[in-house]
Each structure stands twice: as structure tokens, then as C-alpha cells.
């Protein structure tokens, strides 16, 4: 079920949401968090699909804000998605012009679920300081993606400088499988001093830097980053050089 509201207000959106929920037999009390997605015009569909997939495991209220021209007259349009692809979740898509093009606490707060955690996600850009952003200040978790920045390594470095508890970057999340497999591999091997760690990957991938830093800290060994220019390769090989020989883990199909 999808309802479209043109040139509307937060109050009218809430009223329509209540009417749809009553007609659909839906209760917001079953939702565990509010996910606020701050998307860019022309790139929002992929972010919405990802948010819906995530909400299948954690029923949520998803609020997607899409910025349009800030110089246009003030206008707020909304779509309310209930049921169907959203499953047990609900999604409110806001399109803002003029003053409504800026995602602020004043604009979003009236749509938040009461007494539930707030997660904010920037899928296409990296804010100057996530914890000081108008919505970042009220969120318990702030998710960025430094890989989307023009200079991912510099973006990651800056995020580290302004880090506050609750900040998360997807460059670290993408390393979950690598870290799990490497830890399991090292646990199975006899103890031997590590001479050096080499991490191969794209020179633009912040995950390469993060994994190298993590391994150097955990193994107390020097790290060499063997970076290349091809951004689409990402992280593809790790070699741990020990006194009793080398251990290598790599992505199949990539040399």
C-alpha cells in the first residue's frame, strides 16, 4: 500500500500514516528502531532497497529524505509505504525543496517512533562531522560510507579525527568476513612470530587501510599496503609472513 501526499506537512503525514496503519491492521509497537536515510536525488532507489532488506530482520520505521533544489519555493512531498515489499516495516519517503531540502531535526523529529533507537545513514556522502549533524545529534548510531567519498582515505582519516561513540563506517563492516576468516586461520596454526603483513587492494579502498592497521595492531608486526589504481578490485589478498612460513588468503578470480 502506497499513499502519495503533495505539498504536505509532517502533521498531515502522521495523520495519513495512522489512517493507513488502522486500515491495514498494522501496529508501530512491533518496530524496533527508526532508520533515517539521508539520500541524494537520483541515487535513492538503491538505498531504499537496501534499507528494506535490512528491515526484514529488524522491523523498522524507515524515513528516507531526498534533497531537491534548495533555491526552489518551500515544498514537502511524501510517499508512505505500508505492507508489500516493506513487510512488517513502514517507509516514509520525503522529497524536500527550499528549506525542506535540508534534513534537520525539526523536519524529522515528528515522524520518529517514540521510545526507540534512532539510526541515521548517509549512503552517498560523508558529513563533515556525523555526531554534530542536526540528525546525527539525536541518533544513537550514525552510519557513513567513506568509500563513497571523492578521496576515501582522507574521508576515513577525517572521520577518525571527529569520531564519537556511535559512529560506524561501512568500510569496517565490509571487513567482517575477512577478519573472521583470518582470526580462525591464525588460531589453527602453531605459534610463530610474525615478521610482516602485506595487504593487497585498491589504492582508493579505505578497507585496505583499516585491515592493515587492525592486523598490524593485533599481530604487533609491520604492515605493507600493496595498493593498485583499479578502484573496482577493493581488497583482494592478505599475506602474513611468519618465521615458519607465509600464510596467504585471497579472493578467487583476482590475481
Q: What does each model-identified segment do?
A:
Residues 170-225, 233-234:
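ATP/pyrophosphate-binding catalytic subdomain of soluble kinases
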Residues 61-70, 121-123, 144-149, 222-232:
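A generic structural motif
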Residues 77-84, 136-148, 239-253:
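Acidic, Ser/Thr-rich peripheral helices and adjacent loops at domain boundaries
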Residues 51-55, 108-110, 134-137, 212-218:
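Short, solvent-exposed amphipathic alpha-helical segments in soluble enzyme
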Residues 1-120:
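An N-terminal, globular interaction/scaffold subdomain
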Residues 90-183:
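Internal, hydrophobic cores of structured domains that mediate oligomerization or house catalytic pockets
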Residues 15, 20-24, 212-214, 224-255:
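C-terminal structured domains
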Amino acid at each position: 500500500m502506497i499513499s502519495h501526499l503533495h505539498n504536505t506537512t509532517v502533521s498531515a503525514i502522521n495523520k495519513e500514516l495512522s489512517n493507513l496503519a488502522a486500515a491495514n491492521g498494522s501496529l508501530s509497537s512491533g518496530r524496533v528502531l527508526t532508520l533515517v536515510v539521508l539520500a541524494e536525488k537520483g541515487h535513492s532507489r538503491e538505498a531504499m532497497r537496501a534499507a528494506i532488506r535490512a528491515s526484514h530482520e529488524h522491523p523498522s520505521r524507515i524515513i528516507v529524505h531526498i534533497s531537491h533544489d534548495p533555491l526552489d519555493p518551500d515544498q514537502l512531498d511524501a510517499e508512505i509505504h505500508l505492507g508489500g515489499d516493506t513487510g512488517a516495516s513502514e517507509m516514509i519517503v520525503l522529497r524536500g525543496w527550499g528549506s525542506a531540502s535540508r534534513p534537520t531535526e525539526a523536519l524529522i523529529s515528528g515522524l520518529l517512533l517514540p521510545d526507540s533507537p534512532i539510526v541515521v545513514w548517509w549512503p552517498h556522502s560523508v558529513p563533515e562531522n556525523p555526531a554534530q549533524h542536526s540528525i546525527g545529534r539525536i541518533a544513537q548510531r550514525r552510519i557513513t560510507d567513506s568509500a563513497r567519498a571523492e578521496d576515501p582515505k582522507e574521508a576515513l582519516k577525517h572521520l577518525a579525527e571527529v569520531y564519537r561513540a556511535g559512529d560506524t563506517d561501512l568500510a569496517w563492516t565490509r571487513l567482517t568476513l575477512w577478519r573472521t576468516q583470518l582470526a580462525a586461520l591464525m588460531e589453527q596454526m602453531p605459534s610463530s612470530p610474525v615478521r610482516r603483513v602485506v595487504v593487497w587492494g585498491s589504492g582508493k579502498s579505505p578497507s585496505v587501510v583499516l585491515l592493515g592497521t587492525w592486523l598490524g595492531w593485533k599481530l604487533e608486526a609491520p604492515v605493507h599496503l600493496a595498493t593498485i589504481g583499479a578502484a573496482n578490485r577493493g581488497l583482494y589478498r592478505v599475506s602474513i609472513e611468519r618465521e615458519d612460513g607465509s600464510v596467504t588468503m585471497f579472493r578467487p578470480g583476482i590475481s
